[in-house]
């Protein structure tokens, strides 16, 4: 059994977990999430603890048990604390603003870029060069951040573009004459 799957997931107070076959739904203060668990993983709920174990005779069940445990743990964290991803816009004239349910970006193109936000993700712009994305689904928040970053990824010479707040951009040296 994988080391990750051996550690149980503790359910904090105020979080409601419902296990219906291989369908797991978690409700908390920030929202609710539903996930189907792989058929090779057996989930048991005892008191305020979820335990994961691989089923015998199914190939890859050990790895799936660890993956399921990590995903469910992220669901519990999401409905209690939520997830946040910060983006920075670096470059002259690069700006961001919120227009309804979309992020409007000026990234040096001949046209403004509008990125529609999916349900479950909210955005705010504390400054014109910062975007803060929040939501309960870690994967969805990260995917939206990656999609916005992909419009203008940091270039390697000056570092201009959209980057994650904690990202270190490796810059190259300019060509010598």
Swiss-Prot record:
GO terms for molecular function: rRNA binding; structural constituent of ribosome. It comes from the Bacteria. GO terms for biological process: cytoplasmic translation. The keyword DNA-binding does not apply. InterPro entries: Ribosomal_uL6-like, Ribosomal_uL6-like_a/b-dom_sf, Ribosomal_uL6_a/b-dom, Ribosomal_uL6_bac-type, Ribosomal_uL6_CS. GO terms for cellular component: cytosolic large ribosomal subunit. Keywords: Ribonucleoprotein, Ribosomal protein, RNA-binding, rRNA-binding. PANTHER family: 60S/50S RIBOSOMAL PROTEIN L6/L9 (PTHR11655), LARGE RIBOSOMAL SUBUNIT PROTEIN UL6M (PTHR11655:SF14). HAMAP family: Ribosomal_uL6_B (MF_01365_B). Belongs to the universal ribosomal protein uL6 family. This protein binds to the 23S rRNA, and is important in its secondary structure. It is located near the subunit interface in the base of the L7/L12 stalk, and near the tRNA binding site of the peptidyltransferase center. Part of the 50S ribosomal subunit. This is Large ribosomal subunit protein uL6. It comes from Aeromonas hydrophila subsp. hydrophila (strain ATCC 7966 / DSM 30187 / BCRC 13018 / CCUG 14551 / JCM 1027 / KCTC 2358 / NCIMB 9240 / NCTC 8049).
């Amino acid at each position: 059994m994988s080391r990750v799957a051996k550690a149980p997931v503790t359910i904090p107070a105020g979080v409601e977990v419902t296990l219906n076959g291989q369908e797991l739904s978690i409700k908390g203060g920030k929202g609710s999430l539903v996930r189907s668990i792989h058929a090779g993983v057996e989930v048991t709920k005892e008191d305020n603890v979820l335990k994961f174990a691989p089923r015998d005779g199914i190939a890859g069940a050990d790895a799936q048990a660890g993956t399921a445990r990590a995903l469910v743990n992220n669901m519990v964290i999401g409905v209690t604390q939520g997830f946040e991803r910060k983006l920075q816009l670096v470059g002259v004239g690069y700006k961001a603003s919120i227009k309804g349910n979309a992020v409007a970006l000026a990234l040096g193109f001949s046209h403004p870029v509008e990125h529609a936000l999916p349900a479950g993700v909210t955005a705010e712009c504390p400054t014109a060069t910062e975007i803060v994305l929040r939501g309960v689904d870690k994967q969805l928040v990260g995917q939206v951040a990656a999609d916005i970053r992909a419009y203008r990824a940091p270039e390697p010479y000056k570092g201009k573009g959209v980057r994650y707040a904690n990202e270190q951009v490796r810059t190259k040296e300019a060509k010598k004459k």
